[in-house]
A protein has these predicted regions:
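N-terminal cap/lid segment of alpha/beta-hydrolase-fold proteins
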Residues: 6-57
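Short beta-strand/loop motif that positions the catalytic acidic residue
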Residues: 224-226, 231-233, 237
Length: 307
């Protein structure tokens, strides 16, 4: 297969010896044609850089976009177009240990159990700058972070909806999947999971605090998801299996809408079919963002009661 190199944003291809496929095709919002501001969000340990893409006018609802593990905020640029069409200001955030935001003391990912605090700070930033409601977008581990935010944030009542792409719904499932891929004996894999969640495992894992994997099992906690959620997940995802997303949607059909893609690797659903991805997101979000009626309030044109 031959691919044309259209542009080099950084580095020297003559000296490159290795590379990888990324789903991000733009280095920043400006390269995608969006006017953006560089902003800093106060978080634990300092300031986290973010891109702010204003929708214009007085946008009441902001989309806060959370990239996945090992990725950067570039991953979220693909969602800015649909957000703007819906009148949403977009805030593409960084979080602890992602290489942009301040590192945590232990320098380790918390799999969502700690990173959600930085998204909470982003919500506070949005509210201080005119937002009244929030939509969360999350990719991969960013989806796990969004779920934790919707569960634990002091602003959770202001989170109108979530759009999750290839989210981690159950870390035990993902860790077991990777143990199998890497031919790690199941007993060793289970021991590793135990050490993640046990105080005595800190010396082995380097984590400042245990990670409560059960608290992040949204298959078991399916009925506790009370924020309308769209999950987009490829059946061919090689990194985060789509099975838990399916089960979550089945167990909480009232709140969770599930859309599958084919032939897309992890978080690359948009890359396989951007038109469908964007259409799904816009069609699902529009009714979620519609004005809420107060009890007894009639929409214009409704017949009066008893008429």
């Amino acid at each position: 297969v031959l691919r044309e190199v259209e542009a080099v944003y950084a580095g020297d291809l003559d000296k490159a010896r290795r590379g990888w496929w990324s789903g991000a095709i733009h280095p920043d919002p400006a390269a995608a044609g969006y006017a953006a501001e560089d902003v800093l969000i106060e978080v634990d340990g300092g300031e986290a850089p973010a891109w702010l893409v204003p929708a214009g006018g007085t946008a009441r609802t902001w989309a806060i976009m959370v990239h996945g593990r090992g990725a950067t905020r570039q991953e979220a640029i693909r969602a800015v177009g649909p957000a703007l069409e819906l009148g949403l200001t977009s805030l593409l955030v960084s979080y602890r240990n992602d290489g942009l935001a301040p590192s945590a003391n232990d320098g380790r990912y918390g799999l969502g159990s700690t990173e959600w605090h930085d998204v909470d700070a982003a919500i506070e930033f949005a509210l201080a700058n005119g937002a009244e409601e929030i939509v969360l977008f999350g990719w991969s581990m960013g989806g796990a972070i969004c779920l934790q935010t919707a569960d634990l944030s002091r602003y959770r009542h202001l989170i109108r909806a979530m759009v999750l792409d290839a989210p981690v719904i159950n870390w035990v499932n993902v860790l077991a999947h990777h143990a199998q891929l890497n031919r790690i004996p199941s007993l060793v894999g289970r021991y590793g999971q135990l050490m993640l969640g046990h105080p005595l495992g800190r010396r082995l894992t380097g984590l400042a605090a245990p990670v409560d994997l059960k608290a992040m099992d949204w298959v078991a906690r399916a009925v506790e998801v009370r924020t309308p959620t769209l999950i987009i997940h490829s059946v061919d995802d090689e990194y985060v299996p789509y099975g838990p997303s399916t089960v979550l949607a089945e167990r909480n059909a009232e709140m969770v809408t599930f859309e599958t893609f084919n032939h897309a690797r992890h978080t690359k659903e948009w890359n396989v079919d951007p038109e469908r991805w964007e259409s799904l997101v816009k069609a699902w979000l529009r009714p979620q963002l519609a004005p809420r009626l107060n009890p007894g309030q009639r929409q214009f044109g409704d017949a009066p009661a008893g008429g």
